[in-house]
Amino acid sequence: MRRTGFTAFAVVLTLSLAACSSGPDSASDDQRLLVATTVSPITSIASAIAGDRARIEGIVPEGTNSHTFEPAPQVAELLSDADLILVNGLKLEDPTIDLAQNNKKDDTEIVEIGTIVLPESDYIYDFSFPEEEGKPNPHLWTDPGYAIEYAAVIRDQLSELDPQNTTYYARNYTAFEKEATALSEAVASDQQSVPAGNLKLLTYHDAYAYFAEAFGWEVIGALQPKNFSDPSPSAVASLIDQVIAEKVPTIFGSEVFPSVVLEEVGRATGARYEDSLRDDDLPGAPGDPEHSWLGLMKYNFRTMVAGLGGTPTQLDAIAITPNTSEGAVYPQ
């Protein structure tokens, strides 16, 4: 019996040691940079640039309202280990930034990408983001031009921390820039098929202000109040009048912000209610080709073009190839 007990102990000890030294695939032995990110579009762009040369771990679970997200205490461990922390900024993730500042390593930078690329003079304050609140619309990544600028910031940050892979990061940036530019050109082409006067967006949550400004669309309203509560009856009545006056063919909700109110507006006005737009919840599942910034925006743009009476021919032609080096962690 004593021999059997010793053998069992030896097996357990061997397994424990093996677990502690499982090779380069274990997190503890992985010498690559650890990059913490917040919302999934930023996680995806960072992963596209980092490839297999850095570990990318997201913080905000997909399908979560990023404006009201409060990080769980265990996120502090990730932030304390991170070599780089990438956030959108523009007041989107203040609780996460506070947690990062209190737990990060002294030499780890918190990079507010949106704040870097957007001059204060270009801040957009609108329906869900009134100027008196001091929080500009933070949704830059829905404009392919700004997404390219995000990628450039990430490329530069990774290259500074990991100079031996500068050429690799630059090559990945060029590939991303090419994809985002092709997407932009496809939108510009397909929107020409939308009937005159129909390039108007009425949404629940206003995530497309910068996109609309860049492409000549008009955001005529966003139903969600600044405090993310339900809109008042008078606001709904005013919106119904506006939809009728503007002859809006489709109003857009989102999977993250399902809205019974928008359904009611649709019924009252005869406009179609499309509830499947995604603000920062990537389509598909992690590992799927469409589970990416490119997949997200292709889906949203073709949904909007089709909903407004156009034909998304060029958008449908965009191929989304698998990112073979995708290894980012997307909380679900």
What are the functions of these language-model segments?
Residues 5, 9, 19-332:
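Extracytoplasmic metal-acquisition and chelation regions
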Residues 13-17:
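Hydrophobic core
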